[in-house]
Amino acid sequence: KYLVNQYWDPRSFHHPFYGIMCTEYSAAEEQLVGEPWVIYKGTDDRFTEGPHLYKLNGYYYLFVAQGGTVYAHKERAARAKSLYEEFETQPGGPFLTTLDAPYHPIQKAGHGSLVDTPDGEWYFTHLMGRPLHRSQESSIDPRGWCPLGRETGIQKLIWDEDGWPHIAGGHNGLLEVDAPLNVKEHKWEPDCPVKDDFDGDR
């Protein structure tokens, strides 16, 4: 098991979002072990953060957000056969962004994670915003104002023959997405106290 997190560079005249760091986690000891190492520095978009790491079909897939949660927000994918080799960034640019679509109803898309269903369908949940526009302002800059703040969106995800992920309908995403097929609701039983009076020793 591994923990991935953003590595912050405190040095002057260096971009603070240095890259994504990985540290091994021991489930038996319930603690991190060994020394951390940087596995991915992102692209020249910078602001590389929000990592999610998956082991799928012989690859380690790393999903990261870039650009910050603003209109330049985007999600990129990278992969490697080993955590100790260089990660290859998915060719063709970010697989989710609305930076190039100022009139799209979904904006600021990025920063998400994978979901797979029992029937083998794949989805990608992500942050987004739905801006409202003022008639006296440009619809390009600013693109509008998002009174609901950071919202959660979901997109259907497909894998190409080379094993790279793509958003169904294109990298801008869709406003409406078909629900998964044959998925039954799963109700989780609470596994923690509903109330805690914080009167214990710890």
What do the predicted segments below correspond to?
Residues 1-202:
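Carbohydrate-active catalytic/glycan-binding domains of CAZyme proteins
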